[in-house]
Amino acid sequence: MAEVRWIYDLTIFLYAASVLFYFNDFLQSNRKVNRLAFGLLVVVWALQTAFFVSQAVMKGYFPVITLFETLFFYSWVLVGLSLAIHYFFRIDLLVFLPNIIGFVVLVMSMFLPETPIEAVSSILTSELLLTHVTLAMFSYGAFSLSMIFSAMYLLQHKMLKGRRWSPLLRRLPSLDQLEGYAYRMNMLGVPMLLLSIVLGIIWGKMVLGEKFLLDSKVLLSELVLAIYSLWLYQRYRIRCRCADSSQWNVLAFLLLLINFLGFTTSTFHDWW
């Protein structure tokens, strides 16, 4: 780890600079600063990829097992998605906001252990479990973007109701676009989370038996999946497009975060 630690440290430094430049562009709408922020973000993603690959080579498994590894991978997913947003949508605010989350997550990973406990690492590095965690992280990335779209919807809705015209309002996509983007992200996230839970249950029954089924993290994951599935049902069948739907989406993501970071309540996620 020491050999590539400089990559991790440099990544955090450049990521902080990129977020600060994006914040400056958010306040002053400076195109030169925006291009600099985007260039730094590309470098950050490349460094994260290099660090991730080096960890996989050194550890001999796909590094998404410990909380350090999953937070790092989650941050990598968010950076990658924000770059895709820049390419397809060219909406700068949609690049800035996900990377606030991504940077905070990456900084959190600094304070966590980097290597799984040797006694259980052989069990934890099974392909089934690695696929389970990877799908979960990609679904979290999709839900993160969906939450941001819904939060922007609520902000714009409030500004329009209050007739508060500002430069920020002009930089936001329309309400219909924001709602549509949130819907598409949830359409991506729900199947991935479903597959992740199914694979996790299969792995749990093989390794832990029946005792894990009443674990708080398992139950809360199923609740999160049910909430997002119901949200999609209302959006598709009832055509519910309103501020209440966006509020529900934001609250669902908060529950997702509680489930993800509230690892101490779980009886078998103790290796994190």
Curated annotation (Swiss-Prot):
Q: Which keywords does the record carry?
A: Cell membrane, Membrane, Porphyrin biosynthesis, Transmembrane, Transmembrane helix
Q: Superkingdom of this entry's organism? A: Bacteria
Topological category with respect to the lipid bilayer: Multi-pass membrane protein
Q: Where in the cell is it found?
A: Cell membrane
Give me any GO biological process, just one.
porphyrin-containing compound biosynthetic process
Q: Can the keyword Membrane be found in this entry's annotation?
A: yes
Q: Mind telling me which residue stretches traverse the membrane in this protein?
A: 7-27, 38-58, 65-85, 93-113, 135-155, 188-208, 212-232, 248-268
Location, primary (coarse class): membrane
Recorded GO MF terms: heme binding
Q: Which GO terms describe its cellular component?
A: plasma membrane
One Pfam match: Cytochrom_C_asm
Task: Give the signal sequence positions.
Answer: none
Q: What does this protein do?
A: Required for HemL synthesis.
Q: What is this protein called?
A: Protein HemX
Originating organism: Brevibacillus brevis
